[in-house]
Amino acid sequence: MISAEMVKELRERTGAGMMDCKKALEDANGDMEKAIELLRERGLAKAAKRASRVAAEGIVESYIHGNGRIGVLVEINCETDFVARNEEFRQFAKDIAMQIAAANPKYVSREEIPQEVIEREKAILRQQALNEGKPENVVDRIIEGRLEKFFEEVCLLEQPWIKNPDMKIKDLLTEKIAKIGENIVIRRFARFERGEGIEKAASC
């Protein structure tokens, strides 16, 4: 039996509609965590449909961390000015700016990584595997696994979210698209760290 309290709790936790929550709980036989997974899966389907829509509105969010030690600017686009002013969207932008400050990604997505960077990383990983004495026939498989770890480190969308490491940023983005009901795009970002690239003079 699905109670009104269960539907309310699921709605509060996911932001999904009441009927969607009730249906997910029924399909999950009252299992709250399974219902959340079902809603996320269904959200993915909704998000995929919205991903083709033009997102030209949005916000440029800034974040300063550690008494001016690290600064971030990130542009996040949505479809309408109405959503750009929405508190949920603005909080998402803040979360993404904080993620960039903390996790220091180099690219938004793996598609942005130049092919020569990937090839160079593969060559390094191959040499590492051979130096470890791994058999030649398993080296390629090892490289693929380690390359995924590389993507997780350098690509914002592939990184575990600092507020919930069980969720990647791309999952969080998909969740927000489903919840807000518009296509959302993390367009670009810049991260600055005080003194980065400046060689300090040696003290006498």
From Swiss-Prot:
Belongs to the EF-Ts family. InterPro entries: EF-Ts_dimer_sf, Transl_elong_EFTs/EF1B, Transl_elong_EFTs/EF1B_dimer, Transl_elong_Ts_CS, UBA-like_sf. It is found in: Cytoplasm. Associates with the EF-Tu.GDP complex and induces the exchange of GDP to GTP. It remains bound to the aminoacyl-tRNA.EF-Tu.GTP complex up to the GTP hydrolysis stage on the ribosome. This is Elongation factor Ts. Residues 80-83 are annotated as: Involved in Mg(2+) ion dislocation from EF-Tu. Transmembrane segments: none annotated. One of its GO terms (cellular component) is cytoplasm. Keywords: Cytoplasm, Elongation factor, Protein biosynthesis.
